[in-house]
């Protein structure tokens, strides 16, 4: 088995070297990779699991045993977030009513984290207000949210990821430039990147849309791009950038940046999740019109934090958001067809 794996890795390395060329990221080459393994996997679910969720939008595992679901809200009496046990599927409580009063949120979104993290960052869109909620402590108080920290993100910040207790990774638009900065809690910039200097970021800000995820253990931030088939890895310690792509369309980035987003624009990645060992990304390679029709098939791509493309999981469903439980090795996903939360058992592979 070890010999076969070694041969496979060597073959993959040879392929990567032959397919490396400059791309959109400055001072970095794009490496086209094929997966080490392509596998079809089946989902499982039951009708009673998470039945109280109304139109789930986003998912996040916290504290290893809690699934937090952000649902669509319609009235001021609706909760934005509901929490469930991943062991029993029982409801654990709800938090943040829809509204603008004390303890309420009007347009929140969850920051990505890994399943072992006790805390969940929730950003209020429009104001940049960041609330860090201690999920473990909130459980012990009947889900009256326990805030560890409430702050406002700096002006111009459009995306962020935590690098632990000491620093954050901030993406900030300043004029025509996107700055990617590691910033300590006392406000010092400890590392900065300017990856998209070939592009007028102000004009192409939508085309540069991405999902940020961070691994404080290895001080790497992964950026899953939506309109290019690639993931950028920012090494905060060394200042180096590595880019892994899954399709040669990554080389043809100029038309993507220059053309307006429209129904025929191709979107490659849609949603993502991570653990300290793996990155999971929902891959569709479909026009926006095809995706909105619900006919676009999706796959789940799995990478390690070194940027190696490990698995291409073929699924029967068209998926939206995902989250991964590293303890049980179960991937949770939202099935776009019926808005139900489904699961994939991955312990055989990871």
Each predicted region: which residue ranges?
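C-terminal motif of bacterial Sec signal peptides marking the signal peptidase cleavage site
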Residues: 15-18
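Beta-strand-rich domains and repeat architectures in extracellular enzymes and scaffolds
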Residues: 45-80, 278-287
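Loop/turn-rich, solvent-exposed surfaces of beta-rich toroidal or solenoidal domains
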Residues: 261-302
